[in-house]
């Protein structure tokens, strides 16, 4: 009962502070551990510097493929959830998220070094994969996304990134060859 009354008093004091009945200094006046400093926050911050624009156009990627591999399936499941959630929050269009088949590497050794060929030990390493494909992404968005997911890459997980860029067709290819070889009309 005493604990609930103390919580009720604390809530009442906090509500008075938020509604403007108390000032910040008088609200903490009864606490001896708190210093009697009042911090003021300016409402208006100075204007942020202007956004810089570069002259060169941003690179466009048709597809960004991120493949991660590791030995622990649960870690890859968690990282896949994190990477897809990050892509959705950044507004990127997820084309496909899939799990390629795992690779199993088996190693068979003798238990004893020199004798007893019938007694063997078999070791197995399983490598699990996850692939996340993002379509139609700009170069700046790709850099931000990749930096974010690479900084949060768990231990024991490797990442491979494949970018497929969209290029402008050169003018000598755009112009059809049959336009150059038109027979001249004889009059």
From Swiss-Prot:
GO MF annotations in UniProt: structural constituent of ribosome
Subunit structure: Component of the mitochondrial ribosome small subunit (28S) which comprises a 12S rRNA and about 30 distinct proteins.
One example of a Gene Ontology biological process annotation: translation
GO cellular component: a single term: mitochondrion
Gene: mrps10
Cellular compartments annotated: Mitochondrion
Name of the featured protein: Small ribosomal subunit protein uS10m
InterPro entries, sorted: Ribosomal_uS10, Ribosomal_uS10_dom, Ribosomal_uS10_dom_sf, Ribosomal_uS10m
Pfam short name (any one): Ribosomal_S10
Keyword Zinc attached: no
Family assignment from sequence similarity: Belongs to the universal ribosomal protein uS10 family.
Keywords (A to Z) from UniProt: Mitochondrion, Ribonucleoprotein, Ribosomal protein
Cited HAMAP family: Ribosomal_uS10
Transmembrane feature ranges: none
